[in-house]
Amino acid sequence: MAGAAALRRSARRVVRPGAYALSRALQHPERLLSSQASPDRGGVLGSELGRYPPERVRNFSIIAHVDHGKSTLADRLLELTGTIKKGHGQPQYLDKLQVERERGITVKAQTATMFYRHANNQLPASDQPDAPSYLLNLIDTPGHVDFSYEVSRSLAACQGALLVVDAAQGVQAQTIANFYLAFESNLSIIPVINKIDQPTADPDNVKAQLKRLFDIDPSEALLTSAKTGQGLSQVLPAVIERIPSPPGKCDSPVRMLLLDSYYDEYKGVICHVAVVDGALHKGDKIASAATGRTYEVLDVGIMHPELTPTGVLYTGQVGYVISGMRSTKEARIGDTLHQAKSIVEPLPGFKPARHMVFSGLYPADGSDFDALSHAIEKLTCNDASVSVTKETSTALGMGFRCGFLGLLHMDVFHQRLEQEHGAQVISTIPTVPYIFEYGDGSKVQVENPAALASNPGKRIAACWEPTVIATIIIPKVLRLPNRFFSQRALLKYRLPLREIIVDFYNELKSITSGYATFDYEDSEYQQSDLVKMDILLNGQPVDAMATIVHNQKAQRVGRELVDKLKKFIERQMFEITIQAAVGSKVIARETLSAMRKNVLAKCYGGDITRKKKLLEKQKEGKKRMKRVGSVDIPQEAFHELLKVSNSK
């Protein structure tokens, strides 16, 4: 009995992790509002959030070209405000996905709430205890062209943006694209020239580029080094002074924009929202403008930088909501969540993503179809820019036809399926959406080449393919024609999308020694001479390998395809014929010889007819195997087919 009593006393002394830090923070909430790092990080009371009317809230994002220092700058701002401790945690704190850390790129936009005390005069805020404190919502965005949709969704929750430019590399292709995304969203743009500590840094040249390309006053640019901390003290004051506060009506019924969502095994769907009007409290009833379904708010809070419950969110603030959504289909990105039983005008939402690359995803083992379906459903909750439809292949069985924003987007999605959900996936050759017109005047958009049936009764009269406007920036270090007198050349071309989705970017980097940068934007469809190419194994078409190519390149591409397949398909006990065909015409062929068992090994001399009988029997057996046998196509073969270039 004494032991049991001691156990009960011990149990009463158990404190949940973080509870002590939370209680200390709640006793001293002013420490959360310091412009210096605080030793105590904890929760934030809803009553404390009430001290931040929209006039003292700033929502801003960081946009830049790849590898110009966005994530490092975000780390320094989190440290400067005491949101994370200096030297604690991992670099690029907001890059939380494994794929982001392995590739060194930002894939998902991440939000963090910071508290910062700022005075509107020249005295430091630390010397003015009555200086007003501000709530700052920082959104770190991706820089690669394939994730521009992620950037545009993040900007919808912001009123301003930090445009980060490398002091050595200057304005790059994606810098231009991101600037116009922010400009079209009517955001206040603060130029930040980063990496000024580099030996090759030339801030004056970058200022001149900003003036020439964007008409930005050079005096507005901030000179910083996120690595050394130089100049960072001027960034947050500029955010507060130059970026307007979020608009909204505090006394109206609550209205929120659903920015993003992801699935948690225990909590269900966690939604990231921006409160446009009113206030959201735990226990409130909210409804979806898209589905009409009603939910109860089970938890609400901010990202500080992890999920921190507050019990309330006020006008202009960005945070998370857990409302008991169990299906990822209920959380529609861009949806308006509002107070139940109230009539509100839905928010504009987002433009639907335009999918540029399509690929089939199939489970490596046909019995894993349900597991793959479940994994894709969870992942698309966190990546709303992917389209998914079910399809069936005679070669690979049940699978999915998925639409992506680009080849890197597709590659990252595959990697996340494997790393986060343990799915083993076979992916087919990526294609782009084509438009075909038949002789009777009917048109059809083809996203899967296998769906383009070879119907002799319906003659294809014309076909169109999507094009893009490509922007290529070449610096002075490369030898340019004499007509280019400036520090760099900005080249614009109209290119077929199919030509750039595979290896155009890598080839451009190769021939320019890595100096050129590349970006593209969607353009119109253009008429072209296209044909469907089928791959046949032993005379049977493999629908998962069908592709659409330009007619003049069909023979070369067909030859490359069959050559690669011959290298990666394992030899069988029967002969395998690999063919590439356009319609009924075979344009390339390779033969994979059969493995041969030495059936004469046990014959030592003797009558020759005995040997002939054994050889004839083996020959008949191979014919029978070829007739009923199936050819196993390894995943490596599909990967190699992706590398077949259409641009040479």
From Swiss-Prot:
Does Membrane show up as a keyword for this record? yes
Pfam families assigned: EFG_C (PF00679), GTP_EFTU (PF00009), GTP_EFTU_D2 (PF03144), LepA_C (PF06421)
Q: Name one GO biological process term.
A: translation
How is this protein positioned relative to the membrane?
Answer: Peripheral membrane protein
Q: Sorted alphabetically, which SUPFAM superfamilies does this protein's record hold? A: EF-G C-terminal domain-like (SSF54980), P-loop containing nucleoside triphosphate hydrolases (SSF52540), Translation proteins (SSF50447)
- Read off the InterPro entries from this record: EF-4, EFG_III/V, EFG_V-like, EFTu-like_2, G_TR_CS, LepA_C_sf, LepA_CTD, P-loop_NTPase
Q: Which UniProt keywords apply?
A: GTP-binding, Hydrolase, Membrane, Mitochondrion, Mitochondrion inner membrane, Nucleotide-binding, Protein biosynthesis
Q: Which residues bind GTP?
A: 64-71, 140-144, 194-197
Q: Which residues form the tr-type G domain?
A: 55-247
User: What does the record list as coiled-coil region(s)?
Assistant: none
The subcellular location is: Mitochondrion inner membrane
Q: Which domain of life is it from?
A: Eukaryota
Q: Can you list the GO cellular component terms from the UniProt entry?
A: mitochondrial inner membrane; mitochondrial matrix
Q: What is its EC number?
A: 3.6.5.-
Indicate yes or no for the key word Membrane.
Answer: yes
Q: Name one GO molecular function term.
A: GTP binding
Q: Which reaction does it catalyse?
A: GTP + H2O = GDP + phosphate + H(+)
Miscellaneous comment text of the record:
This protein may be expected to contain an N-terminal transit peptide but none has been predicted.
Q: What exactly does this protein do?
A: Promotes mitochondrial protein synthesis. May act as a fidelity factor of the translation reaction, by catalyzing a one-codon backward translocation of tRNAs on improperly translocated ribosomes. Binds to mitochondrial ribosomes in a GTP-dependent manner.
* UniProt record similarity statement: Belongs to the TRAFAC class translation factor GTPase superfamily. Classic translation factor GTPase family. LepA subfamily.
Q: Per its record, how is this protein called by name?
A: Translation factor GUF1 homolog, mitochondrial
